[in-house]
């Protein structure tokens, strides 16, 4: 009984300690902005990106149209002649690989981003393949996803080659033409590197970026560096019955069972929430920049508030909540073709994203058990597990964040969990440090434009992107 009386006092003391720690910790502001002195250079780079956007490189699942990508390669060769004439070039079915021999064969690095883009549908304010330069932005499909990165690392190499520079280690450039549908482009390039016996020290792909307000209540620009990808699966659930006329429905029809299943999953998620080390490091990094004292208190004292954070975070931010557990989103459905017919079979499609503490096998088993409870069968159409996390205390990540600091003074860098998928996943067999980061600024407008209408990138951030890749190449490994 005595211990029960002591417990509230201990709790109050712990909260008081957390409050004092927050009060004495200085609040920081992230006010990094690209230098205005780069306007002329920014416009020159914008012109190169514009020409790249003007070549339509739309790709489709199962599509095979190397001609359009060879037209894009011709444009690249015109824009970056030294890269194409001085580096060793390999093309495999439209996928590009360049090799730049360094002073040492130890710790080679690979810079990559994809050439292909998603279809551009709907009414755009600037034609999707115009490459218009207006209002401080370059407009068009692929501007941010991800021809800006391709332009930047090609330009970085082009300038260094013009200086007669030799990098300290071998450098590879890679660009697939099948990323948007998780095709076999990147695996073909990886197979070629494996044939050569290449083991990479570091891979830099798209994924993270310089993000404006990465979490609500944390204003400013932050370098969010992707350190692993969640796994994913497409799953079909099927309910069957004898069917019948809608005028005399029985209980537990196929659609009713599917609805009950969805309701249970949505109301009581079967997946565990856990604060992974990479996510905890992200919150600790961002905590001093929070605009409110309460958020600084919560994020800056995970030793005390981690259970509370796991409880409230999914309600505050769906993106941040997805970093805590496996997610499932119901996306497609089918049933009867007539309103007055109970279907003999109804189906429901879902997309799942697996977290490391409940990977592919466990998450699928959990959802299958729940589906069976409602009389549903489960079919996994496609699945792959999460990628191994980058060691955020390791040599490669430390070097990477140091280069960010050197290139973008005053910009805070934080580890970040990728809830989407990139080509970097295919490089895991030959690299333990596949880092996802595009050195450009993605504000709310750029985030909306990716795979949507009016995709664009602010051209003032392009010189910084080129400098970042140059600094990464120059860095002693």
Name each model-derived stretch:
Residues 89, 99, 211-212, 271-337, ...:
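An extended, acidic, His-containing surface patch that forms the Zn2+-binding/catalytic region
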Residues 8-141, 162-167:
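Acidic/His- and Gly-rich active-site-bordering loop/insert found
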Residues 138, 144-224:
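Acidic/histidine-rich catalytic neighborhood of metal-dependent amide-processing enzymes
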Residues 115-116, 265-270, 368-376:
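A common structural junction motif
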Residues 252, 363-371:
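Short amphipathic alpha-helices in soluble, non-transmembrane regions
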Residues 187-192, 247-270:
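A short core secondary-structure module
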Residues 1-9:
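Feature marks short, highly hydrophobic, charge-poor N-terminal signal-anchor/signal peptide-like helices
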Residues 228, 249-251, 321, 338-343:
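Short, solvent-exposed beta-strand/turn "edge" segments of beta-rich domains on protein surfaces
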């Amino acid at each position: 009984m005595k211990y029960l009386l002591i417990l509230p006092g201990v709790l109050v003391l712990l909260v008081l300690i957390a409050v004092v720690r927050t009060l004495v910790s200085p609040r920081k502001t992230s006010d990094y902005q690209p230098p205005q002195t780069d306007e002329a250079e920014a416009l020159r780079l914008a012109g190169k990106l514009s020409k790249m956007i003007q070549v339509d490189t739309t790709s489709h699942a199962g599509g095979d149209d190397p001609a359009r990508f060879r037209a894009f390669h011709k444009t690249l060769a015109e824009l970056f002649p030294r890269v194409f004439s001085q580096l060793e070039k390999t093309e495999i079915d439209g996928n590009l690989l360049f090799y730049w021999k360094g002073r040492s064969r130890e710790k080679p690095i690979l810079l990559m981003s994809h050439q292909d883009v998603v279809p551009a549908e709907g009414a755009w304010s600037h034609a999707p393949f115009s490459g218009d330069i207006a209002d401080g932005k370059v407009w068009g499909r692929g501007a941010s996803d991800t021809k800006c990165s391709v332009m930047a690392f090609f330009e970085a190499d082009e300038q260094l080659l013009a200086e007669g520079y030799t990098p300290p280690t071998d450098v590879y450039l890679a660009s697939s033409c099948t990323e948007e549908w998780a095709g076999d482009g990147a695996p073909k390039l990886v197979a070629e590197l494996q044939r050569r016996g290449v083991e990479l020290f570091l891979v830099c792909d798209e994924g993270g970026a310089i993000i404006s307000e990465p979490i609500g209540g944390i204003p400013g620009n932050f370098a969010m560096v992707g350190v692993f990808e969640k796994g994913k699966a497409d799953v079909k659930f099927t309910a069957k019955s004898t069917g019948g006329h809608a005028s005399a429905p029985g209980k537990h029809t196929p659609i009713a069972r599917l609805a009950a299943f969805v309701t249970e999953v949505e109301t009581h998620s079967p997946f565990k929430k856990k604060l992974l080390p990479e996510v905890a490091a992200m919150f600790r990094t961002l905590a001093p920049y929070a605009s409110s004292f309460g958020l600084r208190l919560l994020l800056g004292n995970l030793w005390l508030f981690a259970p509370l954070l796991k409880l409230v975070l999914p309600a505050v931010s769906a993106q941040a909540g997805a970093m805590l557990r496996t997610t499932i989103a119901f996306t497609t459905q089918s049933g009867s073709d007539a309103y007055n017919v109970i279907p003999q079979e109804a189906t429901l499609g879902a997309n799942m994203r697996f977290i490391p503490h409940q990977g592919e096998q466990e998450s699928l088993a959990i959802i299958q058990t729940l589906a069976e409870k409602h009389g549903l069968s489960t079919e996994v159409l496609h699945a792959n597990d999460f990628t191994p996390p980058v060691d955020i205390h390791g040599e490669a990540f430390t070097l990477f964040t140091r280069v960010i600091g050197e290139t973008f003074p005053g910009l805070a860098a934080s580890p970040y969990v990728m809830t989407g998928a990139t080509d970097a996943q295919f490089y895991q067999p030959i690299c333990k440090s596949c880092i996802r980061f595009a050195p450009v600024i993605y504000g709310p407008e750029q985030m909306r434009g990716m795979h949507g209408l009016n995709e664009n990138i602010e051209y003032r951030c392009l010189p910084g992107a080129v400098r970042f890749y140059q600094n990464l190449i120059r860095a002693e490994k």
